[in-house]
């Protein structure tokens, strides 16, 4: 009897041990799976985002990324006199006296050719509705389509997909015009929220559609949000960028009162001769995708966005006054988000508006971050596309991104125009930072080319983004042949 009880006790213990073993084995497997999911989440949260397509329109006849590169690589200045086809009282607007009421002391800006042109039939929009549509909405439809074609993606294939649209836009002067007789389309035609929503509607996209207004930093903030959405899994593809079309000359009049404009309309970024900003306009969209997805789907990678950050000036010297410490912080956070150090970045496409207050503050922030610790013979290079085509406002950030993507692909850092000599308002000896007064070959030793882009909004919202050249050489750009599904638009709109 005692022996039987002992045997039963041993068997019971063995069964308990076996149960415990299987339980612990199950827990170990679940723990491994949890760790794997956590690693995947952490990797996705910091995964580089690929730029797989670009669409844009800018002054000087720029109708694609190759056109923009032609302008900046040739050192062209595309500023011109006020257009005569917008109904502006060009002669009556001008007065050299900055205090003249309702006048502007400049006749110059950088303007789009045929800013109101639009293929309404292709997009299936009735003529009566098109008349009520802000040209900015029309442009976003066209450059979004072009950007997808540039990426080799049939726009109509995305219907029902988790594709997001993030549009930087803040000027809505078209809505101030007489909209009588437009049959109720005025509200949707001039709403900045619809600039994103209309792209999603026309293409049938079901990811987030967000219009971003942080003034001059709008398009870079839009790209930052698109990156965050991709990394979180909220969307699988994103169209991000910005647009500005000056339907009325009110921004010239307003900034003339503040004496913030250059009389000749030229942005002389970081120059001793800097005397104010010059206004421009344009539209740009980049197609963004998680790098792992771009590789899996065989999409050409034009460049990689390694990291980005957005912050606010807070209580600075004034609502519209830049905050140098906040600019330093946004740079540091963007570098941390990218997993890089300041020494890993070769060039910064600066905000560089050529104002006597803003440029010195921005330069000092760059000197205090990127300019420290590196050899003087290998400085951080600084430039600004605003010297070519003015301050394109809500499209300024994406213009800088496109410029830097193209510069990395061509291996050249373009010159910044109108710099007679570096600004004496900046202590350039406090760090290793130099202005690109001439084009330079972009040579690197055993690592990828990297660039940063800055945008600062007049409301105090700052953005900074870190770009890296594509991990493998991208194939030469070629127009996407139109298919039956694109109705022939591929040949017409994919212009490089």
Swiss-Prot record:
Q: State the UniProt keywords alphabetically.
A: Transferase
The record's SMART domains line, in alphabetical order, gives: PKS_KS (SM00825)
Which superkingdom does the taxonomy of this entry point to?
Bacteria
For molecular function, the Gene Ontology terms on record are: 3-oxoacyl-[acyl-carrier-protein] synthase activity
Listed Low complexity bias regions: 474-485
Q: Please give the Pfam families that the UniProt record associates with this protein.
A: KAsynt_C_assoc, ketoacyl-synt, Ketoacyl-synt_C
Locate the region Disordered. Answer: 474-496
PROSITE patterns to which the protein is assigned, alphabetical: KS3_1, KS3_2
Tell me a GO biological process for this protein. glycolipid biosynthetic process
Q: Please give an example of a GO cellular component term from this record.
A: membrane
Q: Where is the Ketosynthase family 3 (KS3) domain?
A: 46-469
Active-site residue list: 216 (for beta-ketoacyl synthase activity), 351 (for beta-ketoacyl synthase activity), 391 (for beta-ketoacyl synthase activity)
Q: What is this protein called?
A: Putative inactive phenolphthiocerol synthesis polyketide synthase type I Pks15
Q: Which organism is it from?
A: Mycobacterium tuberculosis (strain ATCC 25618 / H37Rv)
Question: What's the source species' lineage?
Answer: Bacteria, Bacillati, Actinomycetota, Actinomycetes, Mycobacteriales
- What is this protein's gene name? pks15
């Amino acid at each position: 009897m005692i022996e039987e009880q002992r045997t039963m006790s041993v068997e019971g213990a063995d069964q308990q041990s076996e149960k415990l073993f299987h339980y612990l084995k199950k827990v170990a497997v679940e723990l491994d799976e949890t760790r794997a999911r956590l690693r995947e989440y952490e990797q996705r949260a910091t995964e580089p985002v690929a730029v797989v397509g670009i669409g844009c329109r800018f002054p000087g006849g720029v109708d694609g990324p190759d056109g923009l590169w032609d302008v900046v690589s040739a050192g062209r200045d595309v500023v011109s006199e006020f257009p005569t086809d917008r109904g502006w009282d060009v002669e009556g607007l001008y007065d050299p006296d900055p205090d003249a009421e309702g006048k502007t002391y400049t006749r110059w800006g950088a303007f789009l050719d045929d800013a109101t042109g639009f293929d309404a039939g292709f997009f299936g929009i009735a003529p009566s509705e098109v008349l009520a549509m802000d040209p900015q909405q029309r442009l976003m439809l066209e450059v979004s389509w072009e950007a997808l074609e540039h990426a080799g993606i049939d726009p109509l294939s995305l219907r029902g997909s988790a594709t997001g649209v993030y549009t930087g836009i803040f000027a809505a002067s078209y809505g101030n015009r007489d909209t009588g007789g437009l049959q109720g389309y005025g509200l949707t035609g001039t709403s900045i929220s619809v600039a994103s929503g209309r792209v999603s509607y026309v293409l049938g996209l079901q990811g987030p559609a967000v219009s971003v207004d942080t003034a001059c930093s709008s398009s870079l903030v839009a790209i930052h949000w698109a990156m965050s959405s991709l990394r979180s899994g909220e969307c699988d593809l994103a169209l991000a960028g910005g647009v500005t079309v000056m339907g009325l000359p009110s921004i010239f009049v307003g900034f003339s009162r503040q004496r913030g404009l250059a009389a000749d309309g030229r942005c002389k970024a970081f120059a001793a001769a800097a005397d104010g900003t010059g206004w421009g306009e344009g539209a740009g969209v980049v197609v963004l995708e998680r790098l792992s997805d771009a590789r899996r789907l065989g999409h050409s990678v034009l460049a990689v966005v390694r990291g980005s950050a957005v912050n606010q000036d807070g209580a600075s010297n004034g609502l519209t006054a830049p905050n140098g410490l906040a600019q330093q912080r946004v740079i540091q956070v963007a570098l941390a988000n990218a997993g890089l150090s300041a020494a890993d970045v070769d060039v910064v496409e600066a905000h560089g508006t050529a104002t006597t207050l803003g440029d010195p503050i921005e330069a000092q922030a760059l000197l205090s971050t990127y300019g420290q610790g590196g050899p003087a013979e290998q400085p951080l290079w600084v430039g600004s596309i605003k010297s070519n085509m003015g301050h394109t406002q809500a499209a300024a950030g994406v213009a800088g991104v496109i410029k830097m993507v193209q510069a990395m692909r061509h291996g050249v850092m373009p010159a910044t125009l109108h710099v007679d000599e570096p600004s004496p308002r900046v202590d350039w000896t406090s760090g290793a930072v130099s202005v690109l007064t001439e084009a330079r070959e972009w040579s690197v030793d055993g690592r990828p080319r990297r660039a940063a882009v800055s945008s600062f909004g007049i409301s105090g919202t700052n953005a900074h983004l870190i770009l890296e050249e594509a991990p493998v050489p991208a194939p030469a750009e070629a127009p996407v042949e139109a298919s039956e599904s694109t109705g022939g638009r591929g040949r017409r709109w994919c212009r490089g």
